[in-house]
């Protein structure tokens, strides 16, 4: 990987195109990371990917990877960073207090409470000095806005120093509004627009997931830069179905 660090590109709001990884397959991760994507979203929340499997994926990836942890706890965040993730995506961050805690988990003292171990992130100790000198600045902190409570608190959340980006979760957000799955409902779109407005004013990068590239284009036009399009299992299934359809059509 060459050029500016991933954290720098994210903070200056370059367009960063990624996809979600749910398969604990290093081959899939390697293939995806050589396809022109800027980053990979390793899903440790919904997918059956534990930290050992995630570390294997990180070892084969050729682009920066953000690991979504199962929950916003110090232990989960620490493990994700220790195995070598470029940063974390933390679900259900619904208040500034939660956001401050997440940032603290990601930063070494005196900026936070992250513990130190001899781990993959710093070359098992052999790259300790370099990693420790840069980790606080280069570790990416992404909080998810996927509940109406987070929308209501979004101005305070984006004001938290150390929050690099807000990733909107449309499906869970719609569910919290009593509109599960209705991601294009006017009320859901208005809530998402509220988040976008707050991020724009605060200078925070803004991210979102869509299942299809065509549905992502309008969001990019609106200023979304940390974008995740599709899921590995969907790409695999779609390709197989297309092949069968072509041959039997």
Positions of PLM-derived features:
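Expand to "…catalyze enediolate/carbanion chemistry for C-C bond making/breaking, isomerization
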Residues: 1-249
């Amino acid at each position: 990987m060459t050029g500016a660090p991933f954290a720098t590109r994210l903070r200056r709001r370059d367009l960063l195109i990624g996809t979600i990884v749910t398969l604990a397959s290093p081959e899939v991760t390697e293939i995806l990371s050589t396809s022109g994507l800027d980053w990979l979203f390793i899903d440790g929340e919904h997918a059956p990917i534990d930290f050992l499997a995630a570390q294997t994926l990180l070892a084969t990836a050729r682009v920066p990877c953000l690991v979504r942890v199962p929950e916003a706890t110090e232990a989960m965040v620490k493990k994700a960073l220790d195995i070598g993730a470029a940063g974390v995506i933390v679900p259900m961050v619904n208040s500034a207090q939660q956001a401050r805690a997440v940032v603290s988990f990601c930063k070494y003292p005196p900026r936070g409470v992250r513990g130190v171990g001899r781990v993959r992130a710093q070359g098992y100790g052999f790259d300790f000095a370099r990693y420790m000198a840069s980790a606080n600045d280069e570790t990416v902190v992404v909080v998810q806005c996927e509940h109406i409570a987070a929308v209501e608190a979004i101005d305070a959340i984006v004001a938290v120093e150390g929050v690099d980006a807000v990733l909107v979760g449309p499906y869970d957000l719609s569910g919290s509004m009593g509109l599960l799955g209705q991601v294009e409902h006017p009320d859901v779109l208005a809530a998402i627009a509220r988040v976008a407005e707050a991020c724009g004013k605060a200078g925070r990068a803004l991210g979102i997931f869509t299942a299809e590239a065509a549905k992502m284009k309008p969001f990019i036009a609106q200023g979304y830069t940390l974008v995740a399009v599709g899921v590995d299992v969907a790409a695999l299934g779609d390709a197989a179905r297309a092949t069968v359809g072509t041959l039997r059509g």
